[in-house]
Amino acid sequence: MAHHNGPRKKTRYKFKKDLRKRGIVPVTSLIQHFEIGQSVHIVCEPSIQKGMPHRRFHGKTGKVIGQRGRAWMLTIFDGNMEKIVIARPQHLKAQK
């Protein structure tokens, strides 16, 4: 039997991009800077796998608590439990 339990399982439609949004990711998404305490949305960029958070957190909003290398650390409530998610800036979007 084949192995069916990868980190991107059940994401066929969740990580799908619109037809006109395919291609190279803008450089501005790579060099985003966030302030500590700022609210950000987790929107996974499917064309870049490095630094992608778990699919469970796609579409959630969290607060920035720090930076770890090139990635940002966020706190997110998953049910009643507060969790720390580490994600690169390509997968984050500042809340307006």
Swiss-Prot record:
Keyword Ribosomal protein: yes
A molecular function GO annotation: structural constituent of ribosome
Pfam families in the record: Ribosomal_L21e
A GO-annotated cellular component: ribonucleoprotein complex
Family matches, as SUPFAM superfamilies: Translation proteins SH3-like domain
Residue stretches spanning the membrane: none
Biological processes, Gene Ontology terms: translation
Entry keywords, A to Z: Ribonucleoprotein, Ribosomal protein
Protein family per UniProt: Belongs to the eukaryotic ribosomal protein eL21 family.
HAMAP family: Ribosomal_eL21
Name used for this protein in its record: Large ribosomal subunit protein eL21
